[in-house]
Amino acid sequence: MMRSSTLKLRNKMLKVSDIIQIKIDKIVFGGEGLGYYNGFAVFVPMSIPEDELEIEIISIKKTYARGLIKNIIKASPERIDNHKFTFEDFYGCDFAMLKYESQLKYKRFMVEEVIRKIAGLSDIEISDVLASEDIYNYRNKIIEPFSVYANKIITGFFKRKSHEVFEVDENILNSKLGNKIIKELKEILNKNKISVYDENTHKGILRNIMIRTNSNNEAMVVLIINSNKITENIKKLLFKLRENIEEIKSIYISLNSKKTNTVIGEKNILIYGEKSIKENINRIEFHISPTSFFQINVKQAKRLYDIAISFFDNIDNKYIVDAYSGTGTIGMIIAKKAKKVYAIEIVKSASEDGEKTAKENGIENIEFINGAVEKELVKLVNNNQKIDTIIFDPPRKGLETSIIDKVAELNLKEVVYISCNPSTFARDVKLFSEKGYVLKKLQAVDMFPQTSHIECVGLIERKI
């Protein structure tokens, strides 16, 4: 009771818009720094342990507050070159102020924390995070909204909890070719004074630009506009863009005239070049269209897949389910050794892309099943289809409990779990443990340098 009263008292001492000084003690899961002001917890994005900061309080809750950096009084030695970068300098890249070795250190700490607290495993050994070969310019897909600033067309990112665009001249994560194309496109659009979409009035043409690139330094351009039809003027400007940048192999115009935050329209019209660009992973050629799901950091994705497959005891001639398969990337790699792969994916276009890729690569022992994993897995079992093991790669929300129940019911010896959210991964590990399974191996993989995001690959085995 006394602690609660003390917290309330300290809480009342702070007000929104207060400017205070604080020293950061640690980085918590999610990537924000944590410090204490008169014993009251304050979370600060883009801050690092040993930073001494002047911050502005932006929100206050019962047990904590949040603030943004106004000034760095003394920079942590882990800041890049000790420069005093603040939140706005690397908007959208919440670890970019950290030296890369420190990014890896804190990502490991975050994984250890959730495994210890949520999964309840205090003694599991977590090896060093697998570093990315490319720590800048690794993204093969970028989407930026258009806006207007000082009578000039700009692109960038939405500011935190707002639809105001923060201008980015050169995105440090985007491929160099992607940055080059966006810069050239903005110059062309500004010369021709094309109107920009205003979500309040629902008027204006330009909504978003999407660039997809591949390892061969080829690009697909998708211009999203607020219209039900293509104008000749817009087409001419995009053809001009292609004349200036020969690496562009495909151009689409996406028609999106709805009052929505969804980026891509329902109608994507090819106006130049190929329907897709191609990417090669493990000697399998994948087609990438405007709506295709594909790993953002291809070099690191190859390494992640190799780790996941190596975790299996033996996949030769086995019947394997690739659950949440997307376009079936890892399923097709596994199919080279396995007897049969069932690739289950709820997004129909992803399943269709996978079927096309498998056919073009002569992979006949993979079957794409369009539907929810929890339902389709039951159907496979009810149809007496043999299942030796499963590889999971679910969305951030993790697995449905019914899926974990089904794994236990099948008495599978092992499953491999790829996760983009260590918190839900840890939760599911605990649920598996209640069904007689144990987390045997765990490898964290840095798919997204300069951000706090971290992926994990785990081997979950049935207890003997």
Swiss-Prot record:
GO biological process, one term: rRNA base methylation
Leader sequence segment: none
Enzyme Commission number(s) from the entry: 2.1.1.-
InterPro entries with a match to the protein in the record: MeTrfase_TrmA_AS, MeTrfase_TrmA_CS, NA-bd_OB-fold, SAM-dependent_MTases_sf, TRAM_dom, U5_MeTrfase_fam
Pfam families to which the protein is assigned, alphabetical: TRAM, tRNA_U5-meth_tr
Top EC class of this enzyme: transferase
Keywords per UniProt: Methyltransferase, S-adenosyl-L-methionine, Transferase
GO molecular function: rRNA (uridine-C5-)-methyltransferase activity
Active site: C420 (nucleophile)
SUPFAM superfamilies, A to Z: Nucleic acid-binding proteins, S-adenosyl-L-methionine-dependent methyltransferases
Every TRAM domain range: 13-71
Alphabetical list of Gene3D superfamilies matching this protein: 2.40.50.1070, Nucleic acid-binding proteins (2.40.50.140), Vaccinia Virus protein VP39 (3.40.50.150)
Protein residues bound to S-adenosyl-L-methionine: Q295, Y324, E345, D393
Family named by the database record: Belongs to the class I-like SAM-binding methyltransferase superfamily. RNA M5U methyltransferase family.
Protein name: Uncharacterized RNA methyltransferase FN1713
Source species: Fusobacterium nucleatum subsp. nucleatum (strain ATCC 25586 / DSM 15643 / BCRC 10681 / CIP 101130 / JCM 8532 / KCTC 2640 / LMG 13131 / VPI 4355)
